[in-house]
UniProtKB/Swiss-Prot annotation:
This is Serine--tRNA ligase. Belongs to the class-II aminoacyl-tRNA synthetase family. Type-1 seryl-tRNA synthetase subfamily. Pathway: Aminoacyl-tRNA biosynthesis; selenocysteinyl-tRNA(Sec) biosynthesis; L-seryl-tRNA(Sec) from L-serine and tRNA(Sec): step 1/1. GO terms for molecular function: ATP binding; serine-tRNA ligase activity. Consists of two distinct domains, a catalytic core and a N-terminal extension that is involved in tRNA binding. The gene is serS. InterPro entries: aa-tRNA-synt_IIb, aa-tRNA-synth_II, aa-tRNA-synth_II/BPL/LPL, Ser-tRNA-ligase_type_1, Ser-tRNA-synth_1_N, SerRS_1_N_sf, SerRS_core, tRNA-bd_arm. GO terms for biological process: selenocysteine biosynthetic process; seryl-tRNA aminoacylation. It holds the Pfam family Seryl_tRNA_N. It catalyses: tRNA(Ser) + L-serine + ATP = L-seryl-tRNA(Ser) + AMP + diphosphate + H(+); tRNA(Sec) + L-serine + ATP = L-seryl-tRNA(Sec) + AMP + diphosphate + H(+). GO terms for cellular component: cytoplasm. Catalyzes the attachment of serine to tRNA(Ser). Is also able to aminoacylate tRNA(Sec) with serine, to form the misacylated tRNA L-seryl-tRNA(Sec), which will be further converted into selenocysteinyl-tRNA(Sec). It comes from Salmonella typhimurium (strain LT2 / SGSC1412 / ATCC 700720).
């Protein structure tokens, strides 16, 4: 959520920055609501002061032996007027907050202006895509050859966009997540966490999934006797529970940065993606991901974004997977991000790069919703922290990249050297 003072005092400047990301801010409506808020605020404060003054007069009149009934009736009337004024003000403030919750973050100045993914800017490339001297098989064909990917079974169990993994393919999927966690915890300084896969609505508001993206979530539906369960949804990413661990907390600045990682399944309805990537593991309703989250001082967040992106890149480099790094344009960034890097891995069967990691600086956008603050050791003042999140990496898409980039002419899949310790020294699948 943006700073209310910024919306209140600099609406035109905010509107100009939001226009860069294709969002039209209704400045006239905001101004009208703000003027109304000022009037109601003054009226409420005046009624409160008048009621306090009259209440004090009751005690004085009583001490003088005067009839206090007229004053008491007047105080009661003022109390009713005050309650009505407070209710009207609260309703208006709720309307303003509801509007604020739908406004995306401001883009950082260095983010390229653009409309969609076609305007993203490539920053760098690593590795050279392999040249094959045989016909390339895609990961679905390879998975079926080794009885490792069973989409038909998943359709029977659940429906489309799910998979059953088996045998050595399932083992490699597990090995990838373990390798990523070990790398981030042992070399990159993250602490490993195990988090709930169901979270409440306060948690989803904190990281910005609600109210705007309710349709992208899988919500629980209560049985009649279990009404309390209606307040849950499955996590779309471990960013949600990890970041909310600092909700309503005040952290000493010398405890920052806080760097957390977790391996979880992620659940997304993929609303709006009908017909896209219907074959294989690229776009699933349920997929695994190793997530990175950092909680930092405001002045450190841009450097932390570079560091975090480097941590995701290291996974790809150690796996020997060619990739490119791009900076998202204003029109393609996520709702809460001020700056985002995407890493796209080479997928041979598609002859293109596909997103495998997204690393974002969110500034204080989530922290304001969560009321997550840090305290200076010198003057004890508090301020909002900055939060960052990144994929390190999406496990299923990494599996796709490994299967396709490491395939052999006879259909076998070479196991990358860094994964062999997790697979009992296995060199090839098949």
């Amino acid at each position: 959520m943006l700073d209310p003072n910024l919306l209140r005092n600099e609406p035109d400047a905010v509107a100009e920055k939001l226009a860069r990301r294709g969002f039209k801010l209704d400045v006239d409506k905001l101004r009208a609501l703000e003027e109304r808020r000022k009037v109601l605020q003054v009226n409420t404060e005046n009624l409160q002061a008048e009621r306090n003054s009259r209440s004090k007069s009751i005690g004085q009149a009583k001490a003088r032996g005067e009839d206090i009934e007229p004053l008491r009736l007047e105080v009661n009337k003022l109390g009713e007027e005050l309650d009505a004024a407070k209710a009207e003000l609260d309703t208006l403030l709720a309307e303003i907050r509801d509007i604020a919750l739908t406004i995306p973050n401001l883009p950082a100045d260095e983010v390229p202006v653009g409309k969609d993914e076609n305007d993203n800017v490539e920053v760098s490339r690593w590795g050279t895509p392999r040249e094959f001297d045989f016909e390339i098989r895609d990961h679905v064909t390879l998975g079926e050859m080794h009885s490792g990917l069973d989409f038909a079974a998943a359709v029977k169990l659940t429906g489309s966009r799910f998979v059953v993994m088996k045998g050595q393919i399932a083992r490699m999927h597990r090995a990838l997540s373990q390798f990523m966690l070990d790398l981030h915890t042992e070399q990159h300084g993250y602490s490993e966490n195990y988090v709930p896969y169901l979270v409440n609505h306060d948690t989803l508001y904190g990281t910005g999934q609600l109210p705007k993206f309710a349709g992208d979530l899988f919500h629980t539906r209560p049985l009649e006797e279990e009404a309390d369960s209606s307040n849950y949804a499955l996590i779309p990413t471990a960013e949600v529970p990890l970041t909310n661990l600092v909700r309503d907390e005040i952290i000493d600045e010398d405890q920052l940065p806080i760097k957390m990682t977790a391996h979880t399944p992620c659940f997304r309805s993929e609303a709006g993606s009908y017909g896209r990537d219907t074959r294989g593991l690229i776009r699933m309703h349920q997929f695994d991901k190793v997530e990175m989250v950092q909680i930092v001082r405001p002045e450190d967040s841009m450097a932390a974004l570079e560091e975090m992106t480097g941590h995701a890149e290291k996974v790809l480099q150690l796996l020997g997977l060619p990739y490119r790094k791009i900076i998202l344009c204003t029109g393609d960034m996520g709702f809460g991000a001020c700056k985002t890097y995407d890493l796209e891995v080479w997928v041979p069967a598609q002859n293109t790069y596909r997103e495998i990691s997204s690393c974002s600086n969110v500034w204080d956008f989530q922290a304001r919703r969560m009321q997550a603050r840090c305290r200076s050791k010198s003057d004890k003042k508090t301020r909002l922290v900055h939060t960052l999140n990144g994929s390190g990496l999406a496990v299923g898409r990494t599996l796709v990249a490994v299967m396709e980039n490491y395939q052999q002419a006879d259909g076998r899949i070479e196991v990358p050297e860094v994964l062999r310790p997790y697979m009992n020294g296995l060199e090839y699948i098949g």
